[in-house]
Amino acid sequence: MNKIWKLKNVKVGVAPILWTNDDMPELGGDISFDRAISEMAQAGYQGTEIGNKFPKDAKILLRELKKYNLEIASAWFSGYIISDFEKNFQDFQKHCLFLKALGAKVVVFSEQTYSIQGQNKPLFKDKPYFTNQEFENLAQGLNKFGKWSKQHGIELVYHHHMGTGIQSLKETEKILELTDPEFVSLIFDTGHFAHAGEDIVFCLKRLISRIRHIHLKDIRKEKINELKAKNLSFLEGVKQGIFTVPGDGDIQNYPLFFELLAKNNYQGWLIVEAEQDPRKANPLEYAKKAMDYLRSLISW
């Protein structure tokens, strides 16, 4: 039996993508906002991240979340620092002020210049790469974005992501080395590192000092092999069931992962996030399954 590790100053949430996929409305498009947040609370979660079906008015959103005692942990922001800095900076400022009004402390940033994550292109074959100059430009921009957000009480966490210029451990380490730790931190996504062929415990050891937010997923290796063999896109892989909730897939070293988080005194949110087809994977059942698995390994 695994030891249960105590994580202090940690909250556990679940992302709305279990219920509705914003990138593929055919996955859960019929599931209402209220059903999603009520089931999050029913499964025992403390908070969530913002999805497309969430009210755009902060007061209305807070009122709805209060019914279920849920908080907003963060929200995704699509970055275009490399290709359209000025407009992106304005959009980022608005986004951060909205998050601040909701009581969130973290903004999830992912550079989408050249990204193929939403395109019908082979995920591994057509993965984009940034030049050294683009890395430098991105780092300078991230420092500016992160400095501004910090002044407004929001921490910028960079999201390494499949199908983007920062996908691997090596690419993630490069952008962290080029940025100021005072202004740029990391969101560690177990599913995206595992999907990229990385070992999550090895990555955690390398990156722990910069991690301020965590997404927890699991992967099905046979589905990744199928994606590679058939040259499928990222979204096609999601539809095939590459991702699932922690404990339901092929990541074997979650016990050690949580032990390292505890020993390094990780503070922040743990967000269960596993995009699947809700017709095949009932969201409430999978949210509960993930919660049961987490409670077998950690307390908070």
Swiss-Prot record:
Range of residues in the leader sequence: none
Pfam family for this entry, one: AP_endonuc_2
Catalytic activities: scyllo-inosose = 3D-3,5/4-trihydroxycyclohexane-1,2-dione + H2O
Alphabetical GO biological process terms: inositol catabolic process
Keyword set includes Cell division: no
InterPro entries membership: IolE, IolE/MocC, IolE/XylAMocC-like, Xyl_isomerase-like_sf, Xyl_isomerase-like_TIM-brl
GO molecular function annotation: manganese ion binding; myo-inosose-2 dehydratase activity
Organism of this sequence: Mesomycoplasma hyopneumoniae (strain 7448)
SUPFAM superfamilies associated with the record: Xylose isomerase-like
Keywords: Cobalt, Lyase, Manganese
Protein name according to UniProt: Inosose dehydratase
